[in-house]
Amino acid sequence: MTLGAATANDPIDSTLASPSRDEQRRQANQAAFSRDLEFLSSLANPYYLNHLALSGALSSPSFKRYLKYLDYFRHPKYVKYLHYPQALHFLDLLQNEEEFRLACRDPAFAGEVMAKQIGHWATWRDPENAAGQEQDEAGEQGEARETTGGQTA
């Protein structure tokens, strides 16, 4: 036998050529985990939620079962891989709040949720700044009520 030539009876070369069952299972599990993590992360995007709502996916029973399956990411063993933890909050809302699923159909709602997320990201490390913004917003709302005669839109 020449060096480097593999034969069907050579156990070393055949194990290198095809992964073992355990290795195949590990690779399949890794691919499924990566797919689930990527999908769960995408739930942090309100515009993607709007797309899912408009496509009808949010009302599909099989999709609702998949959302329930994703609950395993709440376990500390898996949650550490999430870059967007608010995805778990949206997952909870999608699983349990019909009103939220319906609201996701409205692009204006998606924009409002996105604006709130951005506002949170801008201030979450600076609670004093966040409190000041809340006071400013409350003051603006009070001024708006005064100009509309106390009526809200």
From Swiss-Prot:
It comes from the Eukaryota. One of its GO terms (cellular component) is mediator complex. Pfam families: Med31. The keyword NADP does not apply. InterPro entries: Med31_sf, Mediator_Med31. It is found in: Nucleus. Keywords: Activator, Nucleus, Transcription, Transcription regulation. Its main location: nucleus. One of its GO terms (biological process) is regulation of transcription by RNA polymerase II. Residues 1-28, 125-153 are annotated as: Disordered. The keyword Nucleotide-binding does not apply. One of its GO terms (molecular function) is transcription coregulator activity. Belongs to the Mediator complex subunit 31 family. Component of the Mediator complex. Component of the Mediator complex, a coactivator involved in the regulated transcription of nearly all RNA polymerase II-dependent genes. Mediator functions as a bridge to convey information from gene-specific regulatory proteins to the basal RNA polymerase II transcription machinery. Mediator is recruited to promoters by direct interactions with regulatory proteins and serves as a scaffold for the assembly of a functional preinitiation complex with RNA polymerase II and the general transcription factors. This is Mediator of RNA polymerase II transcription subunit 31. It comes from Mycosarcoma maydis (Corn smut fungus). The lineage of its organism: Eukaryota, Fungi, Dikarya, Basidiomycota, Ustilaginomycotina. The gene is SOH1.
